[in-house]
Amino acid sequence: MTLETAFAAYEAVRHRLPPPVAGRPAPERARTLADVASRYDAFLLDAFGVLNIGETAIEGVAERISDLRELGKQVLIVSNAAGFPHAALMEKYARLGYDFAPEDVITSRRTLLANLNGPAGMRWGLMATPATGLRDLEDLDLIYLEEDPAAYADVDGFLMIGSAAWTEARQALLEAALADRPRRVLVGNPDIVAPRETGFSVEPGHFAHRLADRTGVVPEFFGKPFANIYELAMARLDPMPPRDRILMVGDSLHTDILGAQAAGIHSALVAGYGFFASGDPHAAIAKSGIVPDVIVDRP
């Protein structure tokens, strides 16, 4: 998927996303977060496009985080990461050179689990990669969604958390099962795409919006740009700053920036990495009407 098709895909599902704040002034331009650090007490950092691109850390960001902490700032990761257990994610961040307490990493996976409700004994069909294991999910009655149509027919609901092993054939089975018998669909990663070293990967949000378009089943989304993940992040901040002194930092207008507006906090769009690394953020801002407070070249 290209930048243009990814942007168009997000624009096509705006009716399922929170509305932007209208009438915002043009964003300020800054070189790095250091230039605006004095205005904020807490920084919520996206992962892909801010901390890393795929499996590669963005140079200088670990040092920036250290500098912010030395200034007394609270720094959390707020990421639409759902495909890996929390412990595996912590191992990844450590491997990339980042030092975070597990409680300071707020993910869409954690958000889904914190909000999971329904009748006792529900059996869930799971969109995930078996190789990542079921840590964090041990208390749920799960079956992997693979090639057996019976699994899709028999479960009480569906959890979409990882799409690396997902196929068009499995998507067709899921859509057919929902058309035959509508059930709950919970999405642990609303991202449509994520920036990788070689381009964009397709994420669970892509398939969730597709099935909504084709079946009429409205998925329940957990993660940016929806309020649930920001509520979890706010609960971690101690002391809780005024909302205009909290800055969400991300590379995506439709998740990071839109979600920050919905949460009533400020936002900084990273223009030099991630979604807009090879594109024009100003044109996208004008077209979408999603306006960050600040555009930074790099974190």
Q: Model features per residue range: what roles?
A:
Residues 81:
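Conserved phosphate/oxyanion-binding catalytic-loop motifs
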Residues 49:
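Receiver (REC) domain active-site loop signature in two-component systems and cognate sites
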Residues 75-78:
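Short glycine-rich or small-residue beta-strand-to-loop segments that form or flank ligand, phosphate
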Residues 1-45, 53-56, 62-73, 84-106, ...:
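Asp-based, Mg2+/Mn2+-dependent phosphohydrolase catalytic module
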